[in-house]
């Protein structure tokens, strides 16, 4: 990735971003869920990713409810394991329940909302390679 930089006297030049990730990846995304049925929020391939850390912002705009959580996910090739923690919300309880499984060669992060109103999940995922 390149960006413009200045030398302080007004001269511009291109430079290369200083971060190179060799054993991990940084991904972000958005998923909207308008049901209380269990739904896939995100997936990653079991043959390339061993574990991931998610930072997730959850918005139920219909009811003006907001929550932010962290989740750690790992797998052994057959089963997936998830730990959700650090929930901060303006509501009396969590807006969703998180689970994880392995299906079709992917780890799936699953959400089950407490309401069927449209809920937006914005996330950042840091994943570690196998």
Regions found by a protein language model. Give the residues of each.
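Extracellular repetitive beta-rich solenoid segments
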Residues: 1-20, 44-52, 58-67, 74-79, ...
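Intrinsically disordered, low-complexity linker/tail regions enriched in Pro/Ser/Thr
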Residues: 23-26
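Generic hydrophobic, helix-prone segments enriched in Leu/Val/Ile
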Residues: 40-41, 70-73, 82, 98, ...
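Charged, amphipathic alpha-helical segments
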Residues: 28-45
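Cysteine-centric segments in proteins
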Residues: 28-31, 83-88, 120-121, 125-129
């Amino acid at each position: 990735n390149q960006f413009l930089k200045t030398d302080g006297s007004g001269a511009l030049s291109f430079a290369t971003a200083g971060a190179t990730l060799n054993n991990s990846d940084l991904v972000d995304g958005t998923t909207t869920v308008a049901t209380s049925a269990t739904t896939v929020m995100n997936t990653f391939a079991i043959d390339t990713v061993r574990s991931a850390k998610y930072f997730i912002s959850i918005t139920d705009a219909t009811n003006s409810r907001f929550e932010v959580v962290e989740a750690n996910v790992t797998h052994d090739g057959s089963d997936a394991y998830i730990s959700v923690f650090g929930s901060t919300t303006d509501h009396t309880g969590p807006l969703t329940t998180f689970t994880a499984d392995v299906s079709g060669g992917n780890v799936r992060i699953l959400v089950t909302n407490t309401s069927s109103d449209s809920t937006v999940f914005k996330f950042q995922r840091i994943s570690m390679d196998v």
